[in-house]
Amino acid sequence: MDKTLKFTDSHEWVRDNGDGTATIGISEHAQEMLGDVVFVDLPDVEDEVEAGESFSLVESVKAASDIYSPITGEVVEINEELEDSPELINEEPYEGGWIVKVKLSDPSELDDLKDAEEYLSSIEEE
């Protein structure tokens, strides 16, 4: 697992891209709980997302799960690959399975998220 990632209690991850944007996806643990992903409902570019608010929906063979934004900002890119290949979320949750890139409104929000170590210990307790 990439140690630069930050995580939420609802199993989303964030990667600070170092240019005022951040990439968001769901964790390996989340995709394992969901099972085979069959559809991802993506937001539109220029949509505003708010920390703690749902911005996407991932449907699997088992369930549909809202995806919550860990940060506030504006969607600057969506992963269009997921429209044809939603299984990328299962195969590469931290690489090809990213969901959106967001221009950060408040970079300090990243400080409120768990680092990889904290996240891993929290899911071991579940």
Swiss-Prot record:
Residues 21-103 form the Lipoyl-binding domain. The modification N6-lipoyllysine is found at K62. Pfam families: GCV_H (PF01597). Its cofactor is (R)-lipoate. InterPro entries: Biotin_lipoyl, GCV_H, GCV_H/Fam206, GCV_H_sub, Single_hybrid_motif. Binds 1 lipoyl cofactor covalently. GO terms for cellular component: cytosol; glycine cleavage complex. One of its GO terms (biological process) is glycine decarboxylation via glycine cleavage system. It comes from the Bacteria. Keywords: Lipoyl. The keyword RNA-binding does not apply. Belongs to the GcvH family. The glycine cleavage system catalyzes the degradation of glycine. The H protein shuttles the methylamine group of glycine from the P protein to the T protein. The glycine cleavage system is composed of four proteins: P, T, L and H. This is Glycine cleavage system H protein. It comes from Vibrio campbellii (strain ATCC BAA-1116).
